[in-house]
């Protein structure tokens, strides 16, 4: 594995690295682990610890999207580009870290549904409320950005651009909370 060789992409970070360098294109994605290569019969793009570096790029994209920047809005909609390129999958599951950072926001705003893990404690209950407030705020900001984009470029040009790059124009059809899973602790004897 050579991280500088774009032909040996093995993790999701390898795709985001192009974005960090200014390219918002998620076309021609090869899945490193295909369903016929494992007993679980799933395809997988592994994560990478360096993916957190992309959060700065995404944070900048959030700000620039509010002013109608075309490249920025494409970056925020990376997940839709990924979905468009991989139409053979029934589901795409994304496991994000426990953060309200810009990368996770972009994943949540472009996911059809999401669920959260919880422990049986007060902090989990407070966290769910916090996530709900943040998501509502993000959705409002994103909707305002779409309106700014349309007023800046006009309805027809915006429609073509949104279609071409799979831009989410209605966050009310995405980002739906479907529930939680409870994590239970088990005691082990050693």
Regions found by a protein language model. Give the residues of each.
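P-loop NTP-binding core
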Residues: 1-190
């Amino acid at each position: 594995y050579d991280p500088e060789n774009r032909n040996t992409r093995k993790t999701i970070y390898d795709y985001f690295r192009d974005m960090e360098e200014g390219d918002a294109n998620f076309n021609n994605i090869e899945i490193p682990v295909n369903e016929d290569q494992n007993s679980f019969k799933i395809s997988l793009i592994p994560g990478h610890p360096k993916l957190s570096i992309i959060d700065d790029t995404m944070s900048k994209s959030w700000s620039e999207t509010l002013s109608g920047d075309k490249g920025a809005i494409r970056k925020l909609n990376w997940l839709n580009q990924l979905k468009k390129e991989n139409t053979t999958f029934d589901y795409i599951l994304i496991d994000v870290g426990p953060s309200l950072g810009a990368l996770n926001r972009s994943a949540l705003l472009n996911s059809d549904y999401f669920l959260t893990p919880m422990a049986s404690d007060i902090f989990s209950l407070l966290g769910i409320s916090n996530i709900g407030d943040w998501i509502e705020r993000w959705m409002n900001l994103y909707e305002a950005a779409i309106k700014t984009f349309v007023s800046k470029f006009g309805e027809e040009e915006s429609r073509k651009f949104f279609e071409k790059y799979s831009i989410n124009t209605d966050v009310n059809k995405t980002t739906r909370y479907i529930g939680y899973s409870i994590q239970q602790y088990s005691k082990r004897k050693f």
